[in-house]
Structures are given as C-alpha cells and as structure tokens.
C-alpha cells in the first residue's frame, strides 16, 4: 500500500476499496519497523486506530468526509495536542502532557485528519541537524551516517520514509525548509502570521511559524488551506483572506515568470555539487519560459548575524518559564527554591539551548543592548526594505536551500558557528517574514538530495507552490521510500 499523493488515497477511501483502519494500521507498522531511527518521540497506536474506526463509521453513516479525511499526519514534538506527551525533545519537559490543542491541530481534526505520532526534533527547535535532541539524532533517509537537517528533522524523515503523508513542523530560521532539502521533500514556511502560533511552544516569537512537510506541493497546499487563517488566540495571526491555494497553483504559468537570482545566494565557497544541481534546476525553469533575472540583495552573512542575536534574545525570555516548578523535570538534589531553579535548568536543558539562553541574556544586558540587539533590529529592517524592493522587479527569488549537502552525524557538533551557516540561505526569508519553500530538484555526486529555495512576496503561497510544483515536475524528483 503506497500513495504518493493524498488524492489517490482519498479516492480509495471514499470508494470503500480501503478503510481508514487498514491504512492507519499499515502506516503504524511502518513506523514500528523504523523505531531504531528515532524518527518519532511518541507513536499514537491506540488513539490513531480509534480515530480511524470513528472515521470509517462516519463514512458508513453517509456523512460528508472532511478535506483531510483519513490522511495520516505526524506532528513535530513542539505542537500541542491535548492528552499527548509534549517534550520538545528536551529532558526538562520529561513526563509533560499537552492540556489543550493547538489551533492548527483543531482545524485538522475538524477536517478528519488522523495523527499517527510526534516527531523528533532539535531541542526546543534550536539546531540544524536534529542532533540536539534528548533522545538522540535521526539518520538521513538517503544515508544513515548523515543528518536529516533540523530542527524538524524527524518530520522530514517521516515523510521521506513514507511513515505519514504530511508532517507539521515549525520554522524559525529554516527548520522546515532545510530538512526538506536534506530529505528530498517539500518544506513550506508560510508568511509570518499566516498560521496561528497558538499551541506552538515558543522559541523566538517574532520568527516562529508552523510549516508543512509533504512529498508534493499539492498535499502541502491542501494542508495549508486547512490550517491557515486568523485566530483570536494569536494576536500575530493575519486577517488576510485565505485563498483557494490549489486553484491559484493551477493558474501559475512559467511563461514570462521573472525569477530573481541573487549573487548573494551563489558565493564562491558554495558547494560545487549544490551549485551545479541548483543551476540546472533554474535552467529548466528558463527553458520552460521563465526569465532568470540577476538581482542584488544584502549578503546573507549579515542576516545570519542579526538572526542569531534576535532569536537568542527572544529565546532567553521565552524559555524562562521552564524552571522545574510547575511541570516537567525537577532536580531532586535542591535544598532550596533558588537551587531548584538553577539545578533543574542546568540538568534539564541541553548544551545548545543553554548556549542560546546565555547569548540571548548577554545581548539584552545593560551596555550591550544598543550594540547588539538594537543594531540587529536595524539590519532586519534593511533586509525587509531590500526584499520589498526586489519584488518590484521579480515574481520569485530562487537559490539553494543549503550551502552544502547533508553532512555527517557529529561533523559540525563541535563548531556551532559552522552549524549555524546551514541556515544561511533560509534565514533571510525568516527575517523579512515572507513565505518560502524548499523543493527537491536533484542529487549530488554521492546521491544526496539537493533542494531549490523559493521566496515569494507576502501571502503569495499559492503562486509560490505553483512554481514549486512546476519545478519539481521538470526535475522529476521523488522522495525516498
């Protein structure tokens, strides 16, 4: 039983050739067969099968099936789902269960989705390799000695291994797109505010956005259409109308499309294989009628510097709530309240999370606020202005998703700065808040996936996914099984 597109599965379910229970049983068996890969932090065996039976009964009663009827979906372990464990892949949330549903979860449940489990991630979404996880790393589906990317590495690996049809992730600076590129799947980060953050555990609140990982752009668009939209429980969610994404995609033509290609996305030190595969993909767009336009944008290195100042500052504030007093891990060897706070956080957080909390506290401290935090906010505004100007000349901006292919497990753990550069091409879209997607376009000389990164103007997800779908079809890539 294998379906690379949800519409194929849906037709089998609605025609009664298959039942939801049969489908979910198959997916759960696959998940169990991959348990040694650490892809899931929790598997919802009983709940998923019970939900499948409920949906089968609904169809038997002749009731209208939802948009996502019977779709097996995985959830990153930082998105709340009532009654399910929620750990953010951290020791400090050991034993915690969600007490409410995220808005995205509510909306998917209302459309008859079935959740099969929670996926592994970098602790509190801080990382680019999925190695910063309390339960261990996830191997890349194409080479088990390499990383799947991060922080949504488990979600990307789950889709690539066909353990679910779609997975939710979160994207702060590239955490959906970079693992999408590393695992040969579509990784979508929508416009900031397009999807409610209610129920998403906060890392950096002015950057965080729930995203979608899928085998193809159609399934990503379908899920986006369900979970997008304003939410009274999230003041940053946008009132911008949610369009029919699939219809918008169908009306996208490559003929005359202006594709901006910034020199900043093709530096001299870019991996040669990555550069070759990406340029070949862009050439296919050009051959199909698009116009490649050279544009100038600020160097991505400035975005990385500003990004890591701003997100660490926000993280130091957001993670102050994890203190061992109300939920999660509490240090057993604490003679007083102050010691309990210190010991619980010291023992509960991993090295990378502690590094970012300390850095964030430093840049917000007296004497350094103007030098670092204020200056980074100014850089952010410059990027926003320059990207707005760029979209007066082009329809989409394209480049590599990552400066290098999936790297070996352990290769960059001793060099945080080198690890941070994995997001050098994805961070600019996060700084400006524009939608972006990684789409599979080919493989390097070792057979490792390479993705093209597309950025569109605010709320142009439909157009962007239409371009991505055309590009994926031209390159004829398919996820690993």
Curated annotation (Swiss-Prot):
Annotated Gene Ontology cellular component terms: glutamyl-tRNA(Gln) amidotransferase complex
Alphabetized InterPro entries for the sequence: Amidase, Amidase_CS, Amidase_dom, AS_sf, GatA
Keywords, alphabetical: ATP-binding, Ligase, Nucleotide-binding, Protein biosynthesis
Gene Ontology biological process terms in this record: translation
Catalytic activity, EC: 6.3.5.7
Cited SUPFAM superfamilies: Amidase signature (AS) enzymes
HAMAP family per UniProt: GatA (MF_00120)
Biological role: Allows the formation of correctly charged Gln-tRNA(Gln) through the transamidation of misacylated Glu-tRNA(Gln) in organisms which lack glutaminyl-tRNA synthetase. The reaction takes place in the presence of glutamine and ATP through an activated gamma-phospho-Glu-tRNA(Gln).
Protein name: Glutamyl-tRNA(Gln) amidotransferase subunit A
Species: Chlorobaculum parvum (strain DSM 263 / NCIMB 8327) (Chlorobium vibrioforme subsp. thiosulfatophilum)
